[in-house]
Amino acid sequence: MRVSFKIQSLLLFLFVFSFLQPLYSEGDLLKISCLKSTERKKQIWIYWGYNRAQYSKSNINFTGPNYDFTLFDICAKDRATPFSARVYFTPNTIWIPQYNYRIGYFLNDWLSLNIGLDHMKYVAVTDQMTKISGRIDSLSSLQYAGNYEQTPIEFTSDFVRFEHTDGLNYVSAELETYGRLWKKNKQELDFFAGYGLGVLIPRSDVDLFDHEGANIFHLAGWGTSLVAGLRFDIIPGLFVNMSVKGGFIHMADIVTMNKQEKAKQKFFFLQEMASVGYSLNYFNKKEKASQNNP
């Protein structure tokens, strides 16, 4: 599995930044300890946003009753929905693009635990040249029947169509740390970094030998990730996030034609996200109210 220079560089940045960020939060390196910490302990927050994604090349293994073969160094891309206010801002269509949502809780003023979904879309590029190893029996395909060993072959739609377009669903929990960069009146700019671990529940759209696949949701594997970004509080309660996430996905149980026919792959990913969120000091207000009314 080859990893592009772009993905290698950004993953290295996220890895280093994530280790340094807790130190930044205390102000040791950026000397921001003189700034008063925002009272975020017990604060609840939620956000919704959209993403673009890039993927490393991957080897994809297909197994079934009459075939067992691997395609090597498959290139893939995301499938971004062209911007339209009607699609991106209408409640019944906001689920069509590549989206993200998370809900979190501040354990203290600088540490947040959250859970959420990254809905990416993964499309193996058609008509690319690849290599194949393994076997395909004539019961599966007369056209492609044979034994292969690193044999060049074209990745055409009548051979294999391989997509996670509804989608590449990464459900994860993340632990993030925050550090102050700037504050004026009610506005504030923070940076954050974190670690995530979760599972993949794709709805894979796969056709083999010109036969339509099952196209069902299925728990296919696991993933892990690092995230870093900026949070800008515009007014109390309302904020925007800009962030980059990089990670590794391993799916060893992808349903293709039916639950007896499977695929497996592993790859690195990068994701750029923009989101709008709302935070609520519900527990703090409740605690203060109980103190004022003993």
What are the language-model segments listed below?
Residues 1-33, 294:
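Bacterial Sec-dependent N-terminal signal peptides
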Residues 25-105, 271-287, 294:
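Short glycine/proline- and aromatic-enriched beta-strand/turn motifs that initiate or cap beta-hairpins
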Residues 33-34, 86-89, 157-163, 209-217, ...:
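Extracellular loop and loop/strand-boundary signature of outer-membrane beta-barrel proteins
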Residues 40-42, 102-207, 275-280:
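Gram-negative (and chloroplast) outer-membrane scaffold detector with strong preference
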Residues 42-44, 95-99, 165-171, 189, ...:
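Residues that define the transmembrane beta-barrel architecture of outer-membrane proteins
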Residues 58-64, 126-132, 203-212, 253-259, ...:
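Outer-membrane beta-barrel translocator domains and adjoining extracellular loop/strand segments
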Residues 59-61, 67-68, 229, 233-294:
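Predominantly the C-terminal beta-signal and adjacent terminal strand-loop region
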Residues 76-84, 148-157, 204-210, 252-257:
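Flexible, solvent-exposed coil segments and beta strand-coil junctions
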